[in-house]
């Protein structure tokens, strides 16, 4: 079995009665005009390789199917909520993903849909998987800076640079790190809040390592 993941980018503009398709799918298609909601849907399928092509699924087929059957589902949800002045919650986003799943489920021939992951912004996603689409996975990236030391006093200076390369420095050196944190939540869990999630990650991890010496400050 092989896995194929394809990103389909599109924009929804609730401020205009009719959207514009556009011609640059790399940026987003539909393209949106002015201020729009930019979304990126990652479609993951698993299956065997087609004998004649070596493909699991032709990626252009994924693009066409998502834009034909799924973009309109997001468009309808966003515009309807905008017209009513209503908030779109994570649970509602997950329900839209499940609607998309039901539409896409039989569209890829012998390949099976295994995951849908919606990128809400470059650092935040919500996903459902084939094991149980009634469960959702919320992920967010966090950044921190820290230093550590790669130097062994038992080695000669030459040996340290041979082993640790340019990171070799008895005084230590620093990096910027990005860590992704994912939580699994059941359908109907209306108590999950992004701000609470971020608060926990900040208190239990980021505050312990950010701008710290990992060799000295972190047990």
Regions found by a protein language model. Give the residues of each.
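Charge-rich, low-complexity N-terminal segments
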Residues: 1-219
């Amino acid at each position: 079995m092989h896995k194929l993941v394809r990103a389909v980018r599109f924009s929804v503009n609730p401020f205009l009665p009719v959207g514009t398709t556009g011609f640059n799918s790399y940026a987003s298609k539909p393209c949106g005009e002015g201020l729009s909601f930019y979304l990126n849907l990652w479609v993951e399928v698993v299956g065997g390789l087609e004998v004649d092509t070596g493909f699991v699924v032709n990626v252009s087929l994924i693009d066409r199917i998502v834009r034909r059957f799924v973009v309109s589902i997001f468009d309808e949800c966003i515009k309807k909520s905008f017209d009513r002045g209503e908030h779109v919650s994570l649970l509602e986003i997950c329900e839209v993903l499940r609607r998309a799943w039901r539409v896409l489920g039989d569209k890829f021939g012998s390949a099976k849909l295994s995951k849908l992951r919606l990128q809400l912004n470059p650092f935040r996603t919500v996903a459902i998987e084939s094991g149980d689409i009634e469960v959702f996975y919320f992920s967010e990236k966090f950044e921190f800076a820290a230093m550590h030391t790669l130097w062994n006093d038992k080695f000669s200076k030459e040996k340290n640079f041979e082993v640790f390369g340019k990171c070799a420095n008895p005084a230590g050196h620093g990096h910027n790190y990005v860590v992704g944190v994912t939580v699994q939540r059941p359908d109907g869990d209306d108590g999950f809040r992004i701000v609470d999630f971020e608060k926990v990650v900040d208190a239990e991890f980021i505050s312990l390592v950010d701008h710290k010496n990992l060799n000295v400050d972190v047990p």
